[in-house]
Design a protein with these regions (language model features):
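A short acidic, helix-capping loop that chelates divalent metal ions and anchors anionic groups
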Residues: 22-24, 61, 87-91, 128-133
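Short, solvent-exposed loop/turn segments at secondary-structure boundaries
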Residues: 24-29, 91-95, 140
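Oxyanion-hole/transition-state-stabilizing segment in secreted/luminal serine hydrolases
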Residues: 60-99
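Conserved, well-ordered alpha-helix/loop/beta-strand core segments that scaffold catalytic motifs
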Residues: 80-82, 115-120
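Charged helix-capping and loop-helix junction motifs
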Residues: 95-104, 148
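Catalytic His-Asp segment of secreted/periplasmic serine-dependent ester chemistry enzymes
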Residues: 126-209
Length: 209
């Protein structure tokens, strides 16, 4: 008699963020959380297609308000967070970002059933290296992005949440037109694939502990 091993139950996944999570200008299948789930399954990690709460242009405060409005009562096996570029773009302070990011981390952990080890944060891409930023002070943008990312990283360390630094990958995309969508600002599937590849081993470690 052949024994059939039942499939492992899917691990629910919630992705929180802004244009970089929704994949502005790219196909839905190219969104980095969707690619992460697709990469995880053949590795024996049955990650479900993600629920996504994200919109182009959102700051930390706007994401938090949208989460409240969504009134999502589910608990997830994995929650991702990538947010902050619009805080920097609008000239908001790092101190305000830190405060609001800390609150979002708490929200993400709540969605993960209070388990910090089921939350992963991705760093803010450096839009100063995009075609959209031509004529702007790229060095100043890079400095500010680094400051925002340092604040996020420190908050993750305090909360014992995993932090994945994808910013170098976005900087390396400079000058490669195939890495950007038609608006010259957002990223195509190949760039977001790199984020998913970089995040996969972190998620594997977290969910197999």
């Amino acid at each position: 008699m052949t024994t059939i091993t039942p499939a492992a139950p899917a691990i629910s996944f919630l992705a929180l963020g802004d244009s970089y999570t929704i994949g502005e200008g790219a196909a839905a299948a190219d969104r980095w959380p969707v690619q992460l789930a697709a990469l995880a399954r053949p590795q024996g990690l049955p990650l479900a297609a993600p629920d996504i709460i994200a919109r182009t242009g959102w700051t930390t405060a706007e994401l938090q308000e949208a989460i409240r409005a969504a009134n999502n009562q589910k608990t997830y096996g994995l929650v991702s967070l990538l947010i902050g570029v619009n805080n920097q773009y609008r000239g908001q302070s790092v101190a305000l970002y830190r405060q609001e990011f800390r609150a979002l981390l708490a929200t993400a952990m709540h969605f993960a059933g209070g388990r910090a080890g089921h939350v992963v944060v991705l760093s803010i891409p450096d839009w100063g290296q995009t075609l959209f930023a031509e004529g702007r002070d790229r060095a100043q943008i890079a400095l500010e992005i680094d400051q925002f990312n340092q604040a996020a990283h420190e908050e993750c360390q305090h909360a014992d949440v995993a932090f994945v630094d994808i910013t170098p990958s976005t900087r390396a995309a400079a000058g490669h037109d195939n890495q950007f969508t038609a608006d010259g600002l957002h990223y195509t599937g190949p760039q977001m694939h790199q984020w998913a590849v970089q995040t996969l081993p972190v998620v594997q470690r977290l969910l197999r502990q």
